[in-house]
Regions:
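Acyl-donor binding region in acyl/amide transferases
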Residues: 184, 190-266
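Short acidic-hydrophobic, aromatic-tinged amphipathic segments that line or gate anion-handling sites
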Residues: 19-23, 67-70, 132-134
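Substrate-recognition/cap helix-loop segment adjacent to the acidic, metal-dependent catalytic center
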Residues: 1-22
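A conserved beta-strand-loop-helix scaffold within acyl/acetyltransferase catalytic domains
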Residues: 131-211
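Terminal substrate-recognition subdomain of acyl/acetyltransferases
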Residues: 37, 59-126, 230-286
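Short, high-confidence coil segments that cap the C-terminus of an alpha-helix
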Residues: 40-42, 173-174, 234-237
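Extended, hydrophobic alpha-helical segments in both membrane/secreted and soluble proteins
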Residues: 1, 31, 47, 54-55, ...
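Conserved Lys-Pro-Asp/Glu-containing loop-to-beta segment of HAD-superfamily phosphomonoesterases
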Residues: 31-52, 58
Length: 286
C-alpha cells in the first residue's frame, strides 16, 4: 500500500480499491479469494497483467475470467482496453455509484463470519433491518437493472425494461415489492424484487423473484415472504402460485419454492401455497 500512501498525486486512491491483495501467491488463487469476498461471478471479473505468463495461468485456471491480451507497449493499454467495451453498462444507478463502498463493507462481513462460532450468532450480530415497499419511480432504473443482470437467484429469468417496470407499478393486476437491507456495516440498498400477477380464483402468481447474490444466506427471502403473506391475507387471497424455469445459471434456486412451503403440482413445474396453511419463518431481519 506504500505507493498509495506516499504519493498523494496518484489519481487512483486506496479507497477506490474494494479488496486489496498484494502477496507472492498464485494470482489465480488470489482472484478466487477476491471473488469469494466480493461474492460475484467469475464471469463478471476482468484480469489485467503485463506479464503474458501470468495471463496464461489465469486463463487456464479460471476460464470464466476475462483476460485481455494486452499490447506490448504500455502506452497503448488504455485505448486497447477501452475499445473492448468490457465496462460498458446500459444504465447507471445509484447502486452502481456506491459499489466500491458496498464491496468494502462486504469484506468486513466476510472477516467477521470467519470468526463467528455459528451462522445464527453471525446473523444476529449483523443487526439487519429490512424494508419492503411497492416499486416507486426513483427505483425503476435499479429494478430494471436487477432483472437484466441477475442470473443466480432468479426464479424465471424474465428480463424487463424500465417501461415494463413502470407498467407493473401502475397495473391493477400486479403487486410489486422492492426489498432493501442494511446492517451494522452499511446499507446494501435495493437488493431484491418480487412481482406478483393476479390470476383467477383469488390467486397470485410469482412472475419474478430476483435477489442480489450479495445477500445470499441472510434469510432475506424468509423476511420477504412473511411480509407478503401478511398482505395477501389482508386482501383475502387464498393461493400463491409459483414456477421455477431452469437456466444454465439459476440452479441456486431450484429448490427455493420447496423451501418456502410451496408444493409442487406433479407432473407440472407449477407450485402452490395455501395462504391459510402458511407458517411464518424465523429469521434475523427486523
Amino acid at each position: 500500500k506504500e505507493p498509495f500512501i506516499k504519493h498523494s498525486e496518484m489519481v487512483l486512491k486506496l479507497d477506490d480499491i474494494s479488496v486489496f491483495v498484494a502477496n507472492w501467491n498464485n494470482k489465480a488463487d488470489n482472484i478466487r479469494y477476491i471473488q469469494e469476498v466480493l461474492n460475484i461471478g467469475f464471469d463478471s471479473m476482468v484480469f489485467l497483467d503485463d506479464n503474458p505468463a501470468e495471463r496464461d495461468i489465469v486463463r487456464k485456471n479460471l476460464p470464466e475470467v476475462t483476460v485481455p491480451e494486452l499490447p506490448e507497449d504500455p502506452a497503448l493499454y488504455l485505448s486497447y482496453v477501452s475499445n473492448l467495451n468490457l465496462f460498458e453498462t446500459a444504465n447507471y444507478s445509484k447502486n452502481d455509484k456506491d459499489r466500491t463502498l458496498q464491496y468494502q463493507q462486504e469484506a468486513k462481513r466476510k472477516k467477521m463470519i470467519s470468526k463467528a462460532t455459528n451462522m445464527d450468532d453471525y446473523l444476529k450480530s449483523l443487526k439487519m433491518v429490512g424494508q419492503i415497499t411497492p416499486f416507486n419511480k426513483e427505483e425503476t432504473p435499479r429494478i430494471a437493472q436487477l432483472t437484466q443482470r441477475s442470473n443466480q437467484f432468479n426464479l424465471r429469468t424474465k428480463r424487463y425494461t424500465e417501461e415494463d417496470i413502470t407498467h407493473f407499478s401502475n397495473s391493477n393486476k400486479h403487486l410489486t415489492y422492492s426489498i432493501k437491507l442494511k446492517d451494522k456495516y452499511g446499507d446494501y440498498g435495493l437488493i431484491s424484487l418480487i412481482i406478483l400477477e393476479k390470476i383467477a380464483n383469488g390467486s397470485y402468481f410469482i412472475d419474478s423473484w430476483i435477489m442480489s447474490c450479495r445477500v445470499l444466506n441472510r434469510g432475506v427471502e424468509y423476511f420477504a415472504l412473511n411480509e407478503i403473506i401478511k398482505e395477501l391475507k389482508k386482501i383475502n387471497i387464498d393461493l400463491l402460485l409459483g414456477e421455477y424455469i431452469e437456466t444454465p445459471k439459476n440452479n441456486l434456486v431450484a429448490d427455493l419454492l420447496d423451501k418456502l412451503q410451496l408444493k409442487k403440482e406433479a407432473p407440472y413445474n407449477q407450485y402452490k401455497l395455501s395462504i391459510e396453511d402458511y407458517k411464518p419463518f424465523n429469521h434475523y431481519v427486523s
